[in-house]
C-alpha cells in the first residue's frame, strides 16, 4: 500500500495493477469479465450500484434471432452467439451452482398477412442454408394462439431462447468470482483514462479499461471521444404468475410473451426514447398488457 496526499487528506491506494478493469456489472461487463478470466487475465469489476442493477437486471429475457434471409456479417455474428448460448450458460450455471433460467424454447409468431406468409415460406428455405440444425417453419396452428389471431398460420423457429436476466447476472457474477474476478460494488467511477480509473474512493490501475456501464456510461464516453456515443432507451415489462412451462415464447404486434422456468411469464416491453425516471412504471405498461 502507499499513501497519496490530495486536497481532501490522505487516500490509501493499492499498487496492484490489473490486466483488465471493467466499469459496469451488467450482462455485458460480466460477460467480458468471464471471458477475460477464462483467459487467465486478472480482472476487476466496479459498479456504482449492485450487480445487475440496471437494464440487465430485468425480467423479459427474450433471445431471438434476425430473419434467416438476406444473410450478412451482422446476422452471422448474432447466429453464432445464439447457437452457442446453450453450451455457454450450462458451463456458467455449473460453475456458479446457480440458475440463469436459460432454455432454448423456440418462438412462435402469428402471421396475419398473406405477404408475410409468402416471406415466411421463403425464409423457411433460407434457414436450411444459414441456420444449420435450427428451423424456421410455417405451421398451421398452435394451442397457445387462437386461429382468429393467426389467419395465415404461424412462424415457429427453434433458435430462439429465454433467459431470466437478473438471475443470469447473479449466476455469471458467481462464476466470475470462482474464477478469481474481484468486484467492487457501490463504487462510482468519476474519471477514467488510459490505464486508470478513479473516484472519491481512490484509484485503480489496469492495462485495459472496458466501459460497460449502460446508458449512464455514454456521458463519460461522449466526453472521452468528443463525439456523441449513444443514448438510453427505457423498457417496461410485466411479470405474471402464469406457468406456461417450456412453451415457446410468443412474439406478436411488437410484444413478447416469455415463459420462465420458475413458473412465471413476462410480457414486454415498451420502448421509450424520452423518459425521466428509469424505474417508474406508468400507463404505457398497462397499454402493453391490454394489447
Per-segment meaning from a language model:
Residues 1-20, 38:
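Extreme N-terminal leader/targeting segments of oxidoreductases
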Residues 69-70, 98-109, 135-179, 270-274:
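Helix-loop-beta segment of a Rossmann-like dinucleotide-binding subdomain
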Residues 76-83, 113-116, 155-174, 279-283:
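Short beta-strand to alpha-helix junction loop
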Residues 28-39, 48, 57-62, 67, ...:
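Active-site substrate-recognition segment that forms the wall
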Amino acid at each position: 500500500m502507499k499513501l497519496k496526499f490530495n486536497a481532501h487528506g490522505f487516500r490509501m491506494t493499492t499498487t496492484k495493477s490489473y490486466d483488465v478493469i471493467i466499469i459496469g456489472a451488467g450482462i455485458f461487463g460480466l460477460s467480458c469479465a468471464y471471458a477475460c478470466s477464462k483467459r487467465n487475465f486478472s480482472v476487476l469489476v466496479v459498479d456504482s450500484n449492485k450487480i445487475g442493477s440496471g437494464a440487465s437486471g430485468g425480467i423479459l429475457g427474450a433471445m431471438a434471432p434476425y430473419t434467416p434471409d438476406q444473410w450478412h456479417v451482422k446476422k452471422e455474428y448474432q447466429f453464432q452467439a445464439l447457437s452457442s448460448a446453450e453450451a455457454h450458460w450450462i458451463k456458467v450455471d455449473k460453475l456458479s451452482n446457480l440458475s440463469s433460467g436459460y432454455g432454448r424454447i423456440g418462438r412462435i409468431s402469428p402471421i396475419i398477412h398473406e405477404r408475410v406468409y409468402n416471406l415466411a415460406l421463403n425464409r423457411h428455405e433460407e434457414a436450411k442454408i444459414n441456420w444449420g440444425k435450427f428451423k424456421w417453419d410455417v405451421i398451421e396452428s398452435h394451442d397457445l394462439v387462437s386461429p382468429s389471431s393467426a389467419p395465415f398460420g404461424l412462424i415457429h423457429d427453434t433458435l430462439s431462447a429465454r433467459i431470466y436476466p437478473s438471475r443470469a447476472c447473479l449466476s455469471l457474477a458467481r462464476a466470475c468470482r470462482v474464477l478469481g474476478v474481484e468486484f467492487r460494488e457501490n463504487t462510482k467511477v468519476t474519471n477514467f483514462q488510459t490505464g486508470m480509473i478513479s473516484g472519491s474512493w481512490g484509484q485503480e490501475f489496469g492495462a485495459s479499461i472496458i466501459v460497460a456501464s449502460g446508458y449512464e456510461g455514454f456521458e463519460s464516453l461522449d466526453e472521452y471521444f468528443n463525439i456523441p456515443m449513444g443514448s438510453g432507451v427505457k423498457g417496461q415489462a410485466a411479470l405474471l404468475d402464469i406457468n406456461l412451462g417450456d412453451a415457446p415464447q410468443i412474439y406478436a404486434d411488437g410484444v413478447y410473451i416469455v415463459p420462465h422456468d420458475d413458473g412465471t411469464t413476462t410480457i414486454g416491453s415498451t420502448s421509450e426514447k424520452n423518459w425521466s425516471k428509469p424505474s417508474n412504471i406508468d400507463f404505457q405498461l398497462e397499454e402493453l398488457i391490454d394489447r
